[in-house]
């Protein structure tokens, strides 16, 4: 997992923040956060992180097509996009938000 590798290599504290959808909880974002935590082998977790990790362990990623956002993509006919989103380890790049500029930057 490129994100977990970046976190291990950066030597800093990192916040994993599931963005959600329109200000609401998002199962797929929480699942992804749990996957990153599992890949990191994180040991000391707060309640939110433990919940994310449990979500990832208990829900098969292919079930994420049934989430609110998954159904939205299906209704828009974006089946290829949805299939792409369900792939793991597709890229070695990680988008990092730069606080100073307010922009994301691709790190490899």
Spans of model-derived segments:
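Long, charged alpha-helical interface segments
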Residues: 10, 27-108
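Internal, conserved structured core segments that host functional sites
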Residues: 1-22
């Amino acid at each position: 997992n490129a994100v977990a590798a970046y976190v291990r290599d950066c030597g800093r504290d990192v916040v994993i923040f599931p963005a959600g959808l329109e200000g609401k909880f998002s199962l797929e974002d929480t699942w992804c956060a749990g996957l990153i935590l599992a890949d990191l082998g994180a040991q000391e977790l707060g309640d939110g992180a433990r919940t994310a990790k449990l979500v990832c362990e208990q829900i098969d990623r292919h079930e994420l097509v049934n989430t609110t956002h998954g159904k939205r993509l299906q209704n828009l006919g974006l089946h290829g996009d949805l299939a792409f989103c369900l792939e793991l380890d597709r890229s070695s790049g990680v988008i990092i938000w730069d606080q100073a500029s307010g922009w994301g930057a691709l790190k490899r």
